[in-house]
């Protein structure tokens, strides 16, 4: 009996030791080791990895030869009780786009998600990714995207809600400068259809706009603008090329197509 009891206790202590050793090893597993043995993704490069897979950082993340800067992460263990694997992240330092951001990203039974995520960059840098415009334009101000919640879908998102803000918005052109004031747009996603609606108003110009993008990559936009009392005269002289405004003084535009 004593020998049997000793054997049982020995197996029990061995099992406890193995469990604690495995947990300790997992908790202290270096992120660089995990990255080295992870599946390689073409076009993705991660440099300067430090810390563990639970709390660590990378000095730079590059995707398709664009540097998105550093990233820091901190695993949220409390979310495990909700069936989620979630990270608190900060990103963007030293990025090519002067991008900055922070928030929460994770994975649940419904797929990948993001919440309370904020990302911002100068409007001037945003213009680098806009198709060529016939008239030279320099944008000023800061563009900020706030994602309240976003749930992964195919090809875009199953559900989501956020706000796109252009603060200190303005544009400098050879014909003069425009002050847009704050430009605010509400952005939603429902069943992989993305929609945005926004407006702005200053003494120079007033406008509203709507845009949508469907799962089959078809887009539709509509917008109008109305010159204000202090609209630059040089620009006023060029409005004749846009045709006549409606009876409210608004110039209307609509576009649709496929990406």
Predicted regions and their residues:
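Alpha-helical transmembrane signal-anchor/signal-peptide segments
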Residues: 29-51
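Amphipathic hydrophobic-ligand
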Residues: 65-73, 94-102, 129-148, 177-184, ...
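Transmembrane beta-strands of outer-membrane beta-barrel proteins
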Residues: 87, 160-162, 221
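Residue-level recognition of well-ordered beta-strand positions that form the cores
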Residues: 59-61, 74, 90, 144-146, ...
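Hydrophobic membrane-insertion alpha-helices, especially the h-region
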Residues: 8-27
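Non-cytosolic head/periplasmic domains of membrane-anchored proteins
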Residues: 99-180
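N-terminal beta-strand/beta-hairpin edge segment
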Residues: 44-136
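Extended terminal
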Residues: 1-13, 37-39, 173-259
């Amino acid at each position: 009996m004593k020998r049997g009891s000793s054997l049982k206790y020995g197996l029990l202590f061995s099992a406890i030791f193995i469990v604690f050793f495995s947990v300790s090893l997992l908790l202290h597993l270096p992120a660089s080791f995990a990255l080295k043995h992870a599946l390689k993704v073409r076009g993705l490069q991660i440099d300067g990895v430090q810390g563990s897979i639970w709390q660590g950082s990378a000095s730079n993340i590059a995707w398709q030869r664009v540097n998105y800067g550093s990233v820091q992460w901190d695993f949220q263990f409390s979310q495990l009780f909700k069936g989620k694997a979630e990270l608190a992240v900060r990103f963007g330092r030293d990025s090519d786009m002067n991008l900055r951001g922070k928030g929460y990203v994770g994975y649940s039974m419904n797929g990948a998600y993001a919440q309370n995520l904020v990302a911002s960059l100068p409007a001037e840098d945003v213009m680098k990714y806009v198709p060529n415009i016939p008239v030279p334009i320099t944008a000023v101000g800061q563009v900020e995207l706030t994602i309240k919640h976003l749930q992964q879908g195919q090809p875009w998102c199953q559900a989501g809600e956020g706000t796109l803000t252009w603060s200190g918005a303005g544009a400098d052109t050879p014909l003069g400068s425009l002050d847009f004031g704050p430009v605010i747009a509400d952005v939603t996603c429902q069943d992989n259809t993305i929609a945005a609606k926004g407006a702005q108003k200053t003494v120079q110009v007033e406008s509203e706009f709507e845009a949508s993008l469907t799962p089959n990559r078809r887009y539709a936009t509509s917008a109008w603008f109305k010159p204000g009392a202090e609209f630059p005269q040089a620009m006023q002289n060029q409005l004749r090329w846009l045709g006549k405004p409606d009876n409210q003084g608004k110039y209307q535009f609509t576009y649709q197509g496929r990406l």
